[in-house]
């Protein structure tokens, strides 16, 4: 199965060690990292007595907030383009940026679903989506949505899907649409489905060679 790996980037904002100990530290992170970052921050706060506060959202939304003056000390973006935009405003400490980890896109459905779908069978897909929608993060600016669109274009099925989208403000909201049964399918990150008992993975997305 071809894999779609998407690199995260990290940037540190000016904060001296003394200030770190006395103030709240804000981590602005892509919504796909909600579970991981929330647990890490909770454990860190409990062990140190410090106050690390995670703020989650679409990387595009977070980047805009940072550019507009939001008090971010750490930014973890789901793609490099939005990190570049923050960098262009000279808001990143020199030398602090690095590729941190990777993720993978998957097609999901409710655990109870009996609908069979194939991303490689246009006729099957058109039939399944008749009167239905597929949840993805907004492909106009959210990294998960941009990657999903690229993957669907690679499969040459974007023209058959683009009018059947339930677009979400971020990938976690797209996941919630499927969890609540509002849509039969969704495209999210593999990390979003970790520990979910009511969602199943149908297939993995193809690799996106040109994704930033």
Which residue stretches match the model-derived regions?
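Exported/periplasmic ABC-transporter solute-binding proteins
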Residues: 20-70, 79-80, 84-89, 93-103, ...
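N-terminal secretory signal peptides that target proteins for export/translocation
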Residues: 1-2
């Amino acid at each position: 199965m071809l894999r779609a790996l998407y690199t995260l980037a990290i940037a540190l904002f000016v904060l001296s060690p003394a200030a770190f100990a006395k103030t709240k530290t804000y981590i602005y992170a892509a919504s796909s990292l909600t579970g991981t970052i929330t647990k890490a921050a909770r454990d860190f706060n409990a062990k140190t007595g410090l106050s690390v506060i995670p703020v989650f959202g679409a990387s595009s939304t977070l980047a805009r907030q940072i550019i507009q003056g939001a008090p971010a000390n750490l930014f973890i973006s789901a793609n490099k383009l939005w990190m570049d935009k923050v960098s262009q405003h000279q808001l990143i400490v020199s030398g602090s940026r690095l590729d941190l980890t990777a993720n993978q896109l998957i097609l999901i459905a409710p655990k109870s679903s009996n609908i069979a779908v194939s991303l490689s069978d246009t006729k099957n897909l058109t039939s399944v989506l008749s009167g239905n929608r597929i949840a993805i993060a907004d492909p106009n600016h959210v990294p998960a949505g941009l990657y999903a669109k690229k993957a669907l274009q690679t499969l040459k099925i974007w023209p058959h899907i683009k009018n059947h989208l339930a677009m979400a403000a971020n990938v976690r909201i797209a996941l919630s649409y499927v969890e609540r049964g509002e849509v039969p399918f969704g495209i999210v990150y593999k990390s979003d489905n970790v520990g979910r008992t009511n969602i199943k993975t149908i297939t993995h997305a193809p690799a996106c060679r040109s994704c930033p």
